[in-house]
Swiss-Prot record:
GO biological process: translation
Disordered: region residues: 1-46
Protein name per the record: Large ribosomal subunit protein bL34
GO cellular component, one term: ribonucleoprotein complex
Source organism, top-level taxon: Bacteria
Organism per entry: Erwinia tasmaniensis (strain DSM 17950 / CFBP 7177 / CIP 109463 / NCPPB 4357 / Et1/99)
Pfam families tied to this protein: Ribosomal_L34
Family affiliation: Belongs to the bacterial ribosomal protein bL34 family.
Lineage: Bacteria, Pseudomonadati, Pseudomonadota, Gammaproteobacteria, Enterobacterales
Any GO molecular function: structural constituent of ribosome
Keywords: Ribonucleoprotein, Ribosomal protein
Signal peptide positions on this chain: none
Amino acid sequence: MKRTFQPSVLKRNRSHGFRARMANKNGRQVLARRRAKGRSRLTVSK
C-alpha cells in the first residue's frame, strides 16, 4: 500500500513557504501570529 505522505521540498515550499505566506493577507496574519508567539522558525522554508 502506498503511504499518504510523499515528501517534496518544492511542493512544501510552494504551499507553506515564506513567499507563499506573504502572497495574501491571511498568510501575513499567520506570520504575525508566529512572530508574536516568538517562534524561531516562521515558515518551513529557510
